[in-house]
Amino acid sequence: MKNTIKIFSAIIYMAAILISSLSFGQMKQESKKTNSAVSASTLKTNMRKLWEDHVIWTRNVILCLVDELPGTDQSVKRLLQNQVDIGNAFKPYYGEEMGKKLTELLYVHINTSAEVVKAAKAGNTAAFDEANKRWYANSDEMSEFLCKANSNWVLADMKMMMEDHLKITTDEANQRIKKDYDADILAFDKINNEILVMADVFSEGIVKQFPEKFKTGGTKLASK
């Protein structure tokens, strides 16, 4: 279990280095891909898919860590890719640096969540409290970062939404650790519903901030 967590952290660290070392040319090429025009309804659908993937693959990793299942490395790799995908989804509106920073914050979110799960499984209250404190600090940092980018997102509401996400994730992991599988499933259903609300907050905020790029129906984004 200890080695699994170390591998988990190492993969995240290596992925962060890889992303930060992207050349300007690579980022330009990526930007062209992520700047493809979409309708407001497509943005909503895509944002929901990305964030739903976030909770699905987070759950998959939780199961791997708690139940010590094979395929943990593969699940971690897929979860990390989701954070890149989420960052990329924000780039057409906020630029390369913002999307990259969001991905980095999400990496910290995931890495710290693994520490929280590890401590909970081990029954190490001190380690759990320390990791949990950093987890919530990262959540607040992410909320502030996002709300600075878009005034349609209210900081107090964003912080509450992010904190609810952490609370439900913790409950999901704890129920799994206790082998209360019914409660575990209920927690996942709850976080799945919660993440769709979060995704809609993001897509609706983007449309409000950039109304000139969106029209109702299937109209495409206006070309720059």
Question: Model-found features: residue ranges?
Answer:
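Boundary of Sec targeting at the N-terminus
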Residues: 24-26
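Bacterial N-terminal signal peptides
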Residues: 10-21
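C-terminal amphipathic alpha-helix
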Residues: 30-31, 39-40, 44, 48-65, ...
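Mid-length scaffold segments of soluble, non-membrane domains
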Residues: 96-130, 135
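Early exported N-terminus immediately downstream of N-terminal targeting peptides
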Residues: 51, 55-85, 90-91, 98-108, ...
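Membrane-interface junctions
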Residues: 3, 92-96, 148-152
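Bacterial N-terminal signal peptides that target proteins for export
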Residues: 1-12
